[in-house]
Amino acid sequence: MQSQESGVHYSRWDSSSRDEVSMTAMSSSEEASCYRRISQKLCSGKLGIAMKVLGGVALFWIIFILGYITGYYVHKCK
């Protein structure tokens, strides 16, 4: 027997007096397959290579800017 995970979504509309509550149940294997499908799409093939390159470039610039700011305050003349 698979474990069931449930979710409750509550939304309230400003213009009307009705509240909407929806409940869904999703098994852990369905949720895992959804995440696996997304990760395979984003981490493999040409799109995966592009994501890794963009992530590396973004990480480089973050470290560069933090180092520049740190160096500015460390070597600042008083």
UniProtKB/Swiss-Prot annotation:
Predominant location of this chain?
A: membrane
Reply yes or no: does the keyword Disulfide bond apply: yes
Please state where this protein is localized: Cell membrane
Chain ranges on the Extracellular side, renumbered to this chain: 70-78
Q: Which Pfam families match?
A: DUF4731
Spans annotated as Disordered: 1-22
- Mark the transmembrane ranges: 49-69
Under the cellular component aspect of Gene Ontology, which terms does the record hold?
Answer: cell surface; plasma membrane
Q: Which residues lie on this side of the membrane: Cytoplasmic?
A: 1-48
- Regions of biased composition (Basic and acidic residues) lie at 11-21
| Mode of membrane association | Single-pass type II membrane protein
Q: Taxonomically, which superkingdom?
A: Eukaryota
| Alphabetized PANTHER family for the sequence | SMALL INTEGRAL MEMBRANE PROTEIN 1
UniProt family annotation? Belongs to the SMIM1 family.
Function summary: Regulator of red blood cell formation.
- Record note on quaternary structure: Homooligomer; disulfide-linked.
Protein name per Swiss-Prot or TrEMBL: Small integral membrane protein 1
Q: Which organism is it from?
A: Mus musculus
